[in-house]
């Protein structure tokens, strides 16, 4: 049962100016919405060719970047200033290297609107949920990508984020780490009834883990198709999954003609 939209993007466009003063368009009239999760969270994805503006779109949603036109709404209110309501995790997640795991999470709470500030029980619960129990005193720069990614997820959850944006997180990971991170994200989405939006150029990944998929065209990026996934039929070897992947590939071929996927 839907309870209204958590995220709405209305006619968002973005232009940049080149070094010679030339103006070029990255995004063109983006429109999409994600409903409020009821139980079990919601996992949506944006699939696009490489260099199509999906990272720019994620930054606009999180209010790190300003749109040239249009607006982003969170629960019906314009969202244009980062406050922890929307948290963006880039392809290479970053934390404060001079802070240990627990300090990084505590700082995320301090700068957010989360009413549960200084709630050590909540912090310990989140540390456990992301698999970092016993590593509270460790520093992020000492560890692997997977470790730093877990810190970023913990910071987002501790800040009370209503939406977590994850930008192409699996591109450079080997299969074992990738599967581990995917399972972690899915578990956290369910446990915390969390809305997660991630971007990728990998059709297979998106179809296997998403409830909803948005197709973003080659630059200037436009959302030209929205696909709902029937989760009851989601099995890696199923004919249904194969047919959805085939449909997406054909849609891109017909729309862009030059799909530059990874």
Residue ranges and their predicted role:
Residues 62:
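Helix-to-loop junction immediately C-terminal to a conserved catalytic motif
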Residues 92, 99-111:
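Q-loop/switch helix immediately C-terminal to the Walker
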Residues 153:
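Hydrophobic anchor residue at the start of the ABC signature
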Residues 164-168:
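Catalytic Walker B motif of ABC-type/P-loop ATPase nucleotide-binding domains
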Residues 117-135, 187:
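Conserved ABC ATPase "signature" region
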């Amino acid at each position: 049962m839907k309870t209204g939209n958590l995220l709405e993007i209305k006619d968002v466009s973005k232009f940049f100016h080149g070094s010679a003063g030339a103006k070029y368009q990255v995004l063109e009239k983006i429109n999409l919405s994600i409903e409020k999760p009821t139980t079990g969270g919601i996992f949506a994805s944006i699939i696009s060719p490489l260099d199509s503006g999906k990272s720019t779109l994620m930054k606009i949603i999180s209010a790190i970047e300003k749109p040239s036109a249009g607006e982003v709404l969170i629960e019906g209110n314009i969202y244009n200033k980062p406050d922890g309501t929307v948290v963006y995790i880039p392809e290479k997640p970053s934390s404060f290297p001079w802070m240990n795991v627990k300090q990084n999470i505590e700082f995320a709470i301090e700068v957010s609107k989360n009413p549960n500030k200084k709630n050590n029980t909540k912090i310990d619960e989140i540390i456990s949920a992301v698999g970092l129990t016993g590593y509270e005193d460790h520093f992020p720069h000492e560890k692997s990508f997977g470790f730093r990614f877990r810190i970023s997820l913990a910071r987002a959850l501790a800040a009370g984020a209503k939406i977590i944006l994850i930008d192409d997180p699996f591109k450079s990971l080997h299969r074992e780490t990738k599967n581990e991170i995917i399972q972690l994200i899915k578990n956290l989405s369910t446990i915390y009834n969390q809305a997660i939006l991630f971007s990728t150029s990998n059709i297979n990944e998106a179809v296997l883990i998403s409830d909803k998929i948005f197709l973003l065209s080659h630059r200037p990026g436009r959302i030209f198709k929205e696909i709902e996934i029937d989760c009851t039929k989601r099995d890696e070897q199923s004919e249904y999954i194969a047919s959805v992947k085939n449909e997406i590939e054909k849609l891109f071929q017909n729309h862009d003609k030059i799909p530059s996927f990874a």
